C-alpha cells in the first residue's frame, strides 16, 4: 500500500505546474535566460545593457511581460514602453529595480527603483498597466518618491495571505 501511495504522489507531481512569473530573465549586455522548459535556454534579444541591477517579470504561463534596468522599461517586444524612460533607478545600483504585482489589480505592477547608494533619488516606485498599449503596457504613474537617501538594495516577500 505504501508503494502505491508513493507512486501516486510521484505521478501527481507531474500534473502540478508552478506559476512562471520568474521564468524569463534579462540581464547584462542584451542577454537573457528562458527557464520555461526546465533547462535554461540562452536569449540574445534583450534590449538592456547593464552590469548590475535589472528586473524581469512574466505572466503565470511564463510569457515575458516587461523588464527594466531601473531607468527604462521595455515591453515584451523589446521596445521602451510609453512613458517608460526616465525612471529614477540606476543601472549601477546592485538592485536597481524590483517588480511586484499589484495585489488588487491583476493588470498592474509596481516597479520599485533604487538609486546608487547615498544619491538624492532614493527609493521610488512607478506603476505599469499591462492592459494598455494593446497589451504591451504603459507606465501610468512614475517616480513617486518613498524615501531618500537610501541604500542600493531592494527585496520583496509575498505575504502569507496571498
Indicate where each model-derived feature is located:
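Bacterial Sec-dependent N-terminal signal peptides
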Residues: 1-23
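Beta-propeller domains
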Residues: 19-95, 101-105, 113-139
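Aromatic- and glycine-enriched pocket-lining scaffold segments that form the walls
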Residues: 140-162
Amino acid at each position: 500500500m505504501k508503494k502505491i501511495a508513493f507512486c501516486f504522489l510521484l505521478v501527481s507531481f507531474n500534473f502540478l505546474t508552478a506559476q512562471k512569473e520568474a521564468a524569463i530573465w534579462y540581464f547584462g549586455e542584451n542577454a537573457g535566460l528562458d527557464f520555461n522548459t526546465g533547462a535554461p535556454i540562452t536569449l540574445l534579444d534583450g534590449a538592456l545593457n547593464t552590469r548590475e541591477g535589472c528586473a524581469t517579470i512574466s505572466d503565470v504561463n511564463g510569457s515575458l511581460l516587461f523588464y527594466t534596468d531601473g531607468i527604462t522599461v521595455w515591453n515584451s517586444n523589446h521596445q521602451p514602453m510609453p512613458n517608460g524612460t526616465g525612471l529614477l533607478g540606476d543601472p549601477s545600483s546592485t538592485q536597481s529595480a524590483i517588480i511586484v504585482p499589484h495585489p488588487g489589480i491583476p493588470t498592474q505592477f509596481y516597479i520599485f527603483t533604487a538609486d546608487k547608494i547615498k544619491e538624492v533619488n532614493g527609493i521610488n516606485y512607478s506603476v505599469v498597466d499591462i492592459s494598455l498599449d494593446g497589451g504591451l503596457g504603459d507606465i501610468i504613474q512614475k517616480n513617486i518618491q518613498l524615501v531618500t537617501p537610501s541604500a542600493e538594495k531592494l527585496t520583496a516577500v509575498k505575504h502569507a495571505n496571498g
